[in-house]
A protein has these predicted regions:
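Aromatic-lined, polymer-binding surfaces characteristic
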Residues: 80
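Histidine-centered, transition-metal-coordinating active-site segments
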Residues: 1-73, 83-403
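Alpha-helical scaffold segments that flank or form the walls of functional sites
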Residues: 76-77
């Protein structure tokens, strides 16, 4: 069970926080994994729970290291770390969508401080001047630094919760994350940072390998990348049509696509639900581009197909864009809309600067060949074309890569 205090319940029961019930954690992953419909709301509760457990454990080990105030604030920081996410989470966290573009951390801070938002009023009433320390914990400017590292680091309660939750939601049975052993393995260094017991390297290996597999198999899944492209392209096309007075947008869609002075209060009214409703309605429009994207999303029919490439480098893949565009055009399609290029980049484990340290002060990389093998950046490139020319596209790509 997840137990919460009356103060935390009041935060959860604000309209600003309840909005997270309607922001899917994994954007469009449910097209590939039908049960992946969990939300930022449940993830935030889970992060709060893990932070509460970890703070309790550290206070047992270091009775004088954590004040009552910080013991109260750190779990609240975990609870609110994602409160600023846009609809569909990271998928719409881009200036391609928002006319008023800010990262979700910045939006979250504004939602916590803007007097028009109910969350701000509740935090001020409950915490008073401690709101400033709460914000410092969340942005990493507080000392001792382990208070912030619990919330945001390469081994934090955010990642621990979402990886377990995403595994369960997608059914991706890869890797192993032993939450109990990880939480029991954490210590506070003399310098005030969060470190891992040297004899618990293997539990961190399990966590990092699981994260690596989840990016390969879930977060970068081909249907996830394709449907995200459909949504972002739909909104970009809708903005274009609106600017040329060929499409009337709903109030909330105008706030996303055209309002360059979007307030925190108006931002807090944006959820997945209105985006889905608007996009699905566009399936009936006369514009073939917008209706094409919308129809595919509404029906899951007529999807573009991934061009399966032989082994290649990113540089080789980048050189395919122009010849594939020519192929698509010569086949009678519009290359601007019917050739979809998705490029994914993600940092793996990053040692040394912000890395995971052991209790002897060394980076965990030095003690684990397994972690060393998944450090650095991993990336991928995908091309999608109409199904009728997939075979031709694959033949062309193979010829060019093998040259």
């Amino acid at each position: 069970d997840i137990e919460i205090s009356e103060d935390v319940r009041r935060i959860i029961d604000t309209r600003t926080f309840q909005r997270l019930r309607y922001i899917q954690q994994l954007a469009t992953s449910h097209y590939a994994f039908p049960s992946a419909t969990h939300t930022r709301f449940s993830h935030s509760l889970g992060a709060h729970h893990l932070a509460t457990r970890l703070i309790g454990r550290l206070r047992e080990l270091y009775p004088d290291a954590i004040s009552d105030e910080d013991a109260r604030l750190v779990p609240i920081a975990a609870l609110l770390h994602d409160v600023g996410h846009p609809p569909f989470s990271h998928m719409f966290e881009t200036p391609e969508v928002f006319a008023t573009f800010r990262g979700h951390e910045e939006w979250g801070r504004l939602l916590m401080q803007d007097e028009e938002c109910d969350l701000s009023g509740v935090l001020t009433e409950l915490l008073g001047d401690s709101v400033d320390r709460l914000l410092a914990i969340m942005d990493g400017s507080v000392e001792p630094r382990f208070l912030s590292e619990i919330i945001s680091s390469q081994l934090d309660v955010d990642r621990l919760d979402y990886l377990k939750r995403d595994q369960f939601g997608t059914g991706a049975d890869v890797g192993s994350i032993d939450l109990d052993r990880i939480l029991r393995s954490l210590r506070i260094s003399d310098e005030g940072g969060l470190v891992v017991r040297r004899d618990r390297v293997e539990v961190v290996e399990g966590y990092l390998v699981t994260r690596w597999h989840m990016y390969q198999l879930v977060y970068f899944h081909k249907l996830n990348m394709l449907t995200q492209a459909y949504y972002v392209r739909s909104l970009a096309r809708a903005r274009h049509l609106h600017e040329h007075e060929d499409l009337r947008l709903s109030l909330r869609m105008r706030d996303m696509l055209s309002n360059r002075e979007l307030t925190p209060l108006r931002y807090s009214q944006l959820t997945d639900a209105f985006v889905i409703a608007d996009v699905f309605a566009w399936a009936d429009l006369a514009d073939p581009v917008l209706s094409g994207y919308a129809t595919r999303l509404a029906s899951r029919d007529g999807f573009h197909k991934r061009v399966r490439l032989p082994e290649h480098t990113l540089e080789q893949a980048d050189k395919l864009l122009e010849p594939l565009s020519v192929l698509v055009s010569e086949a009678g399609f519009d290359a601007q809309h019917d050739l979809i290029h998705a490029r994914m980049r993600k940092e793996g484990y990053l040692p040394y600067v912000g890395g995971i340290l052991l209790d002897d002060g060394s980076d965990i990389l030095a003690s684990s060949p397994m972690i060393k093998s998944i450090s650095g950046e991993f990336s991928n490139t995908m091309f999608f074309v109409p199904e009728s020319i997939r075979a031709e596209a694959e033949q062309l790509a193979a010829q060019l890569i093998q040259q």
